[in-house]
Amino acid sequence: MDPVDPNLESWNHPGSQPRTACNKCHCKKCCYHCQVCFITKGLGISYGRKKRRQRRKPPQGDQAHQVPIPEQPSSQSRGDPTGPKK
């Protein structure tokens, strides 16, 4: 292995940064581009803000899914299920 100049910062060591910039491509070659690309693209781990997904609006005028729920018969009181004690 080549000796590393101790006066250089660790991020300036040879081989510490890839020769090409990272891009948004998710092909196999780009997923293994560097450690950051592997973590974000290959493993799908990102620690940034999560975008809020918008809710899908129901289609207008479609009442097929708006079936009313039939009421359930009321159950007996919540006391002893065997009945009142004498």
Curated annotation (Swiss-Prot):
GO terms for molecular function: actinin binding; cyclin binding; metal ion binding; protein domain specific binding; protein serine/threonine phosphatase inhibitor activity; RNA-binding transcription regulator activity; trans-activation response element binding. A motif (Cell attachment site) lies at residues 78-80. Residues 48-58 have a biased composition (Basic residues). Residues 1-24 are annotated as: Interaction with human CREBBP. Zn(2+) 1 binds at residues 22, 33-34, 37. A motif (Nuclear localization signal, RNA-binding (TAR), and protein transduction) lies at residues 49-57. It holds the Pfam family Tat. Transmembrane segments: none annotated. Residues 1-21, 48-86 are annotated as: Disordered. InterPro entries: IV_Tat, Tat_dom_sf. It is found in: Host nucleus, Host nucleolus; Host cytoplasm; Secreted. Disulfide bonds: none annotated. This is Protein Tat. It comes from Human immunodeficiency virus type 1 group M subtype D (isolate NDK). The gene is tat.
